Amino acid sequence: MGIHSAEKSQLSAKGMLAKVRSIFKQLPEPARDPRGIKPDIPLVDCLMSALAVFGLKLSSLLQFDGHRNIDMVKHNLTSLYHVKKAPDDTNMRQRLDKLDPRSIRPAFTAIFSLLQRGKVLEQYKFLGDYLLVACDGTGMFSSKAVHCENCCEKHHKDGSVTYYHQMLGAVVIHPDQKEVFPLCPEPISKPDGSTKPDQRGDPYP
């Protein structure tokens, strides 16, 4: 297989998923899950199943839980994501909630490197040598009762507090290209050691 053919294979959906899986597989496997039980599903399968939620265009982890045993979904999980056993909604949350988000950054870096070496990003140059990057924030979690030390805080006029997590997402785009390439998302949280809450108040009167 020539170099060009090898690069083309790596840049296919199957090739990029295989690359991501190889990186996820390098993450240390915890001896026990959050319940203190030895995991029966490898961490790499939990991560690839979570990635499949997006690839299979499922709206939530709960919908994934309801579809994971459907023959077509099982086939895609096996053939594309190489998942031998998909976790249920609860198991996936428990395993991934304990994972440091920074540990998955190498997967984004590796795919971006493949796109650079394969000259794919040349097709996304705009106004000369620039890349267009679209950014947006998204809410991940909000509660007035459940919170952690990294939660942002929104103090309301009635004295109540809303605790929330948000994330900044960014993708490389081009007006003439259908595909977009996500960059590693960045969690939005209080700075280390900060005790100052978010004072923006209610967004609507």
Regions inferred by a protein language model and the residue ranges of each:
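Gly/serine-rich nucleotide phosphate-binding loop at the start of the catalytic core
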Residues: 3, 12-87
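Boundary/linker elements of alpha-helical solenoid repeat scaffolds
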Residues: 6-7
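Generic structural signal for well-ordered, non-membrane alpha-helical segments
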Residues: 40-42, 101-104, 108, 200-204
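Short, flexible active-site-proximal loops enriched in glycine and acidic residues
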Residues: 61-63, 74-87, 104-108, 122, ...
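Short, motif-level signal for alpha-helix interfacial/capping segments enriched in acidic residues
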Residues: 64-68, 109-118, 199-205
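Active-site-proximal, Lys/Arg-enriched surface segment
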Residues: 93-177
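Electropositive, glycine- and tryptophan-enriched low-complexity nucleic-acid-binding patches
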Residues: 155-205
